[in-house]
């Protein structure tokens, strides 16, 4: 087994990536670090986002001697990867919206990207569309409200379908046939989204591709960090003083045995 993987997100959206990684690496140690004190990232100034993310990720990666870092956040991935690669010598995996497979899959040649406002406005996103969706009509939809709906669901609350329907109405009206979920929070409410959009709209995310990339990189670059540890270690660290009982329960159900605030974590 390899040394621990550090998975980072602004909130619980990265758990959609964690779930896919666990399917292919069920015995792998993981540390899930979520910066819920600054949620949602899609509305932060770029300089603030970059500085905070790089500091948090580097601090924790060094503490746990991580084999690999997954930035399981689209908003952060568009900005922080260069800074991380300057400071860390381990592989860094970011999340890229699934524009390329969506363009190949769309029969109508009409796709949508649903992401946070920050991801929607970045030049990186426009470059992806220009490179991989040539010949397709691409519509962009930004929403921070869906991030909070996903957070609420994982904390044990029912999804507010009225709010969700209002957020998705422009997509329903667009008549597209393929929708890219460009935020790792969104797969958490994918079943509710499918219910509203109907089966005529295919939903795509990057979770499986990220998990496959992680496996490849661990085998390719991390052989020097193989450890002998028969006890799985799944740790979740948050940046607020506390989290809800509902979220604590959901994290425990996913196998996390240590769930602590960054201020009280003793992982060094």
Curated annotation (Swiss-Prot):
Q: Which reaction does it catalyse?
A: L-glutamate = D-glutamate
Task: Name the EC number(s).
Answer: 5.1.1.3
In terms of Pfam families, this protein maps to: Asp_Glu_race (PF01177)
Which domain of life, per UniProt?
Bacteria
The pathway it acts in is: Cell wall biogenesis; peptidoglycan biosynthesis
For this UniProt record, give its keywords in alphabetical order, as a comma-separated list: Cell shape, Cell wall biogenesis/degradation, Isomerase, Peptidoglycan synthesis
Q: Does the keyword Transmembrane apply?
A: no
Q: Where does substrate bind?
A: 9-10, 41-42, 74-75, 184-185
A GO BP term, please? cell wall organization
Catalytic center residues: 73, 183
A single GO molecular function term of this UniProt record: glutamate racemase activity
Q: Which family does it belong to?
A: Belongs to the aspartate/glutamate racemases family.
Q: What does this protein do?
A: Provides the (R)-glutamate required for cell wall biosynthesis.
Under the heading HAMAP family, the entry gives: Glu_racemase
Question: Any idea what this protein is called?
Answer: Glutamate racemase
Instruction: State which gene encodes it.
Output: murI
């Amino acid at each position: 087994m390899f040394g621990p993987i550090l998975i980072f997100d602004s909130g619980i959206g990265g758990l959609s990536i964690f779930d896919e990684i666990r399917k292919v690496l069920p015995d792998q140690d993981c540390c899930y670090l979520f910066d819920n004190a600054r949620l949602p990232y899609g509305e932060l100034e770029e300089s603030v986002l970059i500085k905070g993310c790089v500091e948090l990720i580097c601090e924790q990666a060094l503490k746990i001697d991580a084999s690999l870092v997954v930035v399981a956040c689209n908003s952060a991935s568009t900005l922080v990867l260069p800074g991380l690669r300057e400071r860390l010598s381990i592989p860094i995996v970011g999340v890229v919206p699934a524009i390329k497979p969506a363009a190949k899959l769309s029969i109508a040649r009409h796709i949508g990207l649903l992401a946070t406002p920050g991801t929607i406005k970045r030049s990186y996103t426009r470059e992806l569309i220009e490179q991989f969706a040539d010949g397709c009509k691409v519509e962009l939809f930004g929403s921070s409200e869906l991030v909070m709906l996903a957070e609420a669901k994982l904390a044990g609350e029912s999804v507010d379908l009225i709010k969700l329907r209002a957020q998705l109405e422009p997509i329903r009206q667009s008549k597209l046939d393929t929708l890219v979920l460009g935020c790792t929070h969104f797969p958490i409410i994918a079943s509710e989204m499918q219910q509203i959009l109907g089966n005529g709209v295919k939903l795509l995310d990057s979770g499986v591709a990220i998990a496959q990339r992680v496996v490849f990189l661990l085998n390719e670059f991390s052989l020097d960090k193989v450890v002998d540890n028969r006890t799985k270690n799944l740790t979740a660290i948050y940046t607020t003083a506390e989290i809800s009982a509902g979220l604590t329960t959901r994290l425990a159900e996913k196998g996390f045995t240590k769930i602590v605030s960054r201020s009280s974590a003793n992982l060094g």
